[in-house]
Amino acid sequence: MKNIRILGFVLILSIGAFGQKESADLIVAHGIVVTMNPERTIYQDGAVAVRGDSIVAVGPRAEIEAKYQASQVVDAHGGLVLPGFINGHTHVPMTLFRGLHDDVTLNDWLYKYIFPAEAKNVNEEFVRWGTRLGAAEQIRSGVTTFVDMYYFEDVVAEETKAAGMRGVLGETFIDFPAPDNKSEAAMLAYTEKFLKKWQGDALIQAAPAPHSIYTCSKKTLQDAAALARKYHAPILIHVAEMKKEWEDSEKQNGMSPVQYLNEIGVLGPDVIAAHCIFVDASDRKLLAEKGTGCVHNPSSNMMIASGVAPVPEERAAGIAVGLGTDGPAGSNNDLDLMEEMDLAAKLAKITKMNPLALGAKDVVAMATIDGARAIHMEKEIGSLEVGKKADLALISLDEPNAVPMYDVYAQIAYSLKGSDVETVIIGGKVVMRDRKLLTLDEPKILEKAREYGKSVKASLGME
């Protein structure tokens, strides 16, 4: 009887203590929490509490569990808990062109192969299934936010939201008939409707995406920028990617691509500039002063031999530099941002002949908090801090390539792979648990991708 009384007393105390806890919808526990906050705090046995789509607490597991109760607990099993990765530049529907005509120059790839292939194959359904395939691949490697430029971008938005991903999605402006719009007037009308539809959405940020200064007239560039600013949207554009682009701009405009964009009123703190390879000291100063974000795409730049972005100098100038995969066709055949971290660091080291040129901690930042700064979303994502969106990637340390671990950042940048990502949470919702995708029908997506591979080959007379 005495034992029963004691047990009852303990139970009452437990219930009382439990009742005093704050509620959370989800707690991620038993992980090494790499916050990427300004202090770069790491909790060796940490936890993250989530309410709704946002983080309400980050800290030692014992403290979080003492203060919060949650309806759902995700066990990190001693692995890493990171901010979700940010793919700052890609063309996701082009997953369905993966491997189509590699090992050619960018100019030949665009004009001889891809533009004709797009004219014959790209429609809403192509974009729909390409986006589903790209979303599956990105989630599997820990990407929670991506910046896209393509056609039928409203379809990309629908599928991105259905997958539970966060997207900054740009409708392409280009000075020749595109698969979805055959004139600038049609492009403007489509894009304005697109911007209106997605304004205020929790996951989707719609944007105009003038392709580049070599495919868009001054008027097209200015019209796209004006539309973006009317709706307080970002502007996505390729900038100074090729030497020929820089040479032509100097010859035709008397100035560099960066200076030209500034001269015509496009450059600004709302611009996300992909590549930024051919940028000298004056260009870098201008980019920093304007608050323009740059996105480094090492795999792409290496694959098409377009050049090496001066990332250490850009960062030293105060430019926010993120990472992107580009591709996923022709310029890079995968969407694994962890691979880009590894390559970015090593590419900087070898080109500068300096092993200190760009370190592991630098490239992890470029994939997270600096990537968020580059796409002007650092107040919402990029680090595990109270008030930010609950976008997390949980990475296993139970594979041969993951042990032993002496330095967390070096392990992430140089040892771990996208395939080591186990669980992904976006906006407080689990979209992949224990490597199983929860928002996408992966077998069906793979089946459709194979079908598209056959139809694309047939359309180009490759069979």
Spans of model-derived segments:
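Metal-coordinating catalytic core of metallo-dependent amide/deamination hydrolases
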Residues: Q20, V155-I277, R284
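Alpha-helical scaffold segments that flank or form the walls of functional sites
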Residues: R98-M165, M187-G200, R450-S455
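Hydrophobic faces of well-ordered beta-strands that scaffold small-molecule active sites
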Residues: I86-T90, F146-V147, G167-G170, A206-P210, ...
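Active-site gating loops and adjacent loop-to-helix segments of metal-dependent hydrolytic enzymes
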Residues: L96-W129, R166-A185, K243-D270, K290-G293, ...
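Active-site glycine- and acidic-residue-rich loops that bind
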Residues: V147-Y150, A207-D223, M302-A305, A374-H376
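Active-site microenvironment of metallo-dependent hydrolases
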Residues: N3-I12, A17-G46, V50-R61, K67, ...
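His/Asp/Glu-enriched, well-ordered alpha-helical/loop segment
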Residues: E263-D270, P312-P400, A413-K417
